């Protein structure tokens, strides 16, 4: 298979597309045919050599992916060709990640899904949704009826957080520095879009 392999930390030129062994079938692991993957800052840090001793080389980077099941353990409930996403859990760090035609990850990291969205869209979702959802549920324990202010509301994580917060029943305020984005925030269900001048406390207090 093809893979983007980082032989050692350094410049982007150290990332080389080359032939790489197909991950073998393993008990408790799922082999995924990768259709798309997002690019993450942590991968940049690894490429620059800033991930410490956790990463060994050569390594196929990539901490998230979207694709279809190629091989799964018996009794896993997953079937060949099923759409899935996977992320984190040392993926692309202590074992090869998603910068390849195929990757193999522990079953516990695989999330089945079904969508008609194009792969290039789905590939950007796992880490974005995980970051937003974890912030709202684990970090904030956001409850219905509460009010949430999102700085940087037009970013991918900001938009994801807003959508999830609305599903939880929260009132959502979101900021943007661009007046032409206010309409977009309103269309996304934001209760109060705010222009971020760097000093938004007074604007928020006008309404709450």
Q: Which residue ranges define each predicted feature?
A:
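Extreme N-terminal starter segment of soluble prokaryotic enzymes
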Residues: 1-2
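Conserved hydrophobic/aromatic beta-strand scaffold that supports enzyme active sites
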Residues: 17-19, 66-68, 102-104, 110, ...
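Glycine-rich beta-strand-centered segment in the early N-terminal region that forms part
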Residues: 21-38, 50-91
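Cytochrome P450 core scaffold surrounding the K-helix E-X-X-R motif
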Residues: 41-48
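NAD(P)H dinucleotide-binding glycine-rich loop of Rossmann-like/cofactor-binding domains
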Residues: 86-152
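Mid-domain Rossmann-like dinucleotide-binding core that forms the NAD(H)/NADP(H) cofactor-binding site
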Residues: 125-199
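Short amphipathic alpha-helix with an adjacent loop that forms part of the alpha/beta core around
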Residues: 200-208
């Amino acid at each position: 298979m093809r893979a983007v392999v980082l032989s050692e930390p350094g410049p982007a030129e150290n990332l080389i597309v080359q032939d790489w062994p197909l991950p073998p079938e393993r008990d408790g692991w799922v082999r995924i045919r990768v259709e798309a993957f997002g690019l993450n800052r942590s991968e940049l840090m690894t490429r620059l050599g800033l991930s410490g001793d956790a990463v060994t080389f050569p390594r196929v980077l990539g901490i998230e992916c979207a694709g279809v099941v190629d091989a799964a353990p018996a009794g896993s409930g997953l079937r060949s060709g099923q759409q899935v996403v996977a992320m984190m859990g040392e993926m692309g760090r202590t074992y090869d990640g998603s910068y390849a035609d195929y990757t193999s990850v522990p079953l516990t990291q695989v999330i089945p899904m079904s969508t008609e969205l194009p792969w290039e869209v789905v590939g950007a979702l796992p880490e974005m949704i995980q970051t937003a959802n974890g912030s709202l549920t684990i970090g904030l324990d956001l409850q219905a009826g509460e009010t949430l202010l999102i700085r940087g509301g037009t970013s991918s994580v900001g938009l994801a957080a807003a959508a999830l917060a609305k599903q939880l029943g929260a009132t959502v305020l979101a900021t943007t520095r661009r007046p032409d984005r206010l309409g977009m925030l309103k269309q996304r269900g934001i209760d109060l879009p705010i222009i971020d001048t760097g000093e938004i406390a007074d604007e928020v207090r006008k309404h709450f």
